[in-house]
Amino acid sequence: MPSVNIKRSDNEITIGNPELKPTVSYNFDLSADYYFRSIGLISAGIFYKKIDDFIVDQVSTNYEYQGNTYTRFTQPKNAGNANLVGVELSYQRDFSFIAPALKCVGFYGTYTYTHSRVEDFNFEGRENEKDLSMPGSPEHIANASLYFEKGGLNLRLSYNFASDFIDEMGESTFYDRYYDKVNYMDVNASYTFGKKFKTTFYAEANNLLNQPLRYYQGTKDRTMQAEYYGVKVNAGVKINF
């Protein structure tokens, strides 16, 4: 018997699916790396994935269960098969090639492009839809970090980006839920000293851009949920005996 979770405050129900098939993935990766004489490397790669019977949450409205009607019904289902092809790039290097004094300063960055397409889509009423992206697969992902490391002092400024992607699939494209694109920026600092009792003072500030958690339904102008958390600051001291 499948699990049943009822959220009465929102009149929502989630039911498990004992008929789920395991997801199977066939992967191919090819990459090339070049290492600089000083610390650092540049890397480029391509990949291909064939995924069979991927699982995604299907959402329906006005669902009846044991005499009650729920406004939102969620159940995981095998949605079909998918093909993913993409490119991965990464670069890491300190700045000593500019001047020896800049050896303590460096940069690290990655970028991933993924093109995904669903085949044999088997949601009832949507079998003939084409050009669907695989749920949970953003097209663009990028990360970058600028750092300073000298002695016990470490400073780092980081940036992360991911484009929007399908999170849940509904009865039609109108009801598909998307996780909106995100831009995160964080800064971290720490200083470590001592030999017998190694002590580290640290501080960090996350979400400097006040990036919200946002979902939209169908099209970007139809906000489904938006939550702002502001900047989170954390500081402290660690002592190793």
What is each stretch, according to the model?
Residues 48-50, 69-166:
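Gram-negative outer-membrane beta-barrel transporters
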Residues 17-21, 76-80, 100, 129-133, ...:
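Outer-membrane beta-barrel domain signature
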Residues 24-28, 81-87, 138-142, 181-185, ...:
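Residues that define the transmembrane beta-barrel architecture of outer-membrane proteins
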Residues 52, 105, 161-169, 190-241:
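C-terminal beta-signal and adjacent terminal beta-strands/loops
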Residues 38-42, 98-100, 152-156, 195-201:
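Repeated loop/turn-to-beta-strand initiation elements of outer-membrane beta-barrel proteins
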Residues 1-28, 46-74, 163-172, 206-220:
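Surface-exposed extracellular loop regions of Gram-negative outer-membrane beta-barrel proteins
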